[in-house]
Amino acid sequence: MLEIDDQMDMQLSAEIILIQGDTAQLVAGTAEEPFQNNLELILRGNHTTPDQPLPNGPNLGAKALGVCGKLQIHGQDVGRTWTRLAATAAAGSNTILLSEDVDPTYWKPGAELVIAPTAFEPLETEKVVIASVDGKTITLTEDLMYEHLGAEYSLEDGSASWNISAEVGLLTRNVKIIGENYAEMGEEEFGARVLVTKFEQEGTTYRGYAKIANVEFVRAGQEGWTDAFDPRYGLAFVNHEDSVDGDESGKESYVKKCAFNHNYNAALGTFNTNNVLIEDNVVFRTMEYGIRDEGIGNRFIHNLMVLNRFVLAIWLVCIKSYMFEQSDSWVFTRINE
């Protein structure tokens, strides 16, 4: 087991990391004792970096963290990961009023937020930086470019109403998995990836499990690899099979309170993977999919997804997905609160 030292801020850098074996573990904070300092796990590489093939199963590729053992990464618990506006924020304003209390320890100066659009133009999504916090009032470092509604719409007869307030998500975490930037990054869109999977070698099965909470994925995913047998998403579970809630031997996987901050493919996918809990995550700027599910019994609860780009169709669509529990589906524009 490799446990990352939590005595100081840490930065680790590699082209490929592979965790392989029943007793092989990479630990950076646990659910009971989250990582307290700042940690950056930087994955390096570009389109010319040699792939790391597995003996069978999906290709690990490059700029990758492969999990065929156990991975535990837990950052500091940020509390509420997203909320809504309590009042309309006008274009040109540098303050927003939130509808719910947030933890000022994490919703703090320097932290990044994403504010969803409330018009028909998805590119009115705004990524902003906090300058100061006073209760539910947040002052930003720059003025807003667009109006974001904080309102409720009701039918004239009062028979129904809808909250149409813009969502506000917290993107910053103290633990980050980062795709290293490079000169051709904008053209190649080749970010970091985490693959949780299994393979067999000489009669032994190496199966991966991952517990990931309060982690920020920065410049993740690799554009162009979208097939179910090789999904180069920010985080993909492939042939993971069953997660067992609370299993003491570690056969449990979940993704909770994470932020996917600027992705070059889908943020997250589950393929031949069952019973994984994916809850309270904030997803900003994805390609093709926000989250893709091809498993059974996976639980997607209270996740916010903003700005999904469908490049092949040459159009953009903003996905705002709040709460859904379903399986055997591809998630495109699911709204169910």
Regions found by a protein language model. Name each.
Residues 1-86, 105-128, 138-210, 302:
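Extracellular beta-helix/beta-solenoid repeat scaffolds
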Residues 3, 18, 27, 66, ...:
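Extracellular beta-strand solenoid repeats
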Residues 7, 23-25, 38, 181-190, ...:
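Short glycine/acidic-rich loop motifs that flank beta-strands on beta-rich extracellular proteins
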Residues 31, 112, 118-120, 133-135, ...:
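An acidic- and aromatic-residue-enriched active-site/binding cleft used to recognize and process polar
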Residues 91-134, 242-246, 250-254, 263-269:
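A conserved hydrophobic secondary-structure block that centers on an alpha-helix together
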Residues 132-138, 222-223:
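Short, conserved beta-turn/loop elements at beta-strand boundaries and strand-helix junctions
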Residues 173-174, 209-219, 249-264, 274-288, ...:
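Right-handed parallel beta-helix
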Residues 178-262, 274:
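Conserved, compact domain cores that house catalytic/ligand-binding motifs in diverse enzymes
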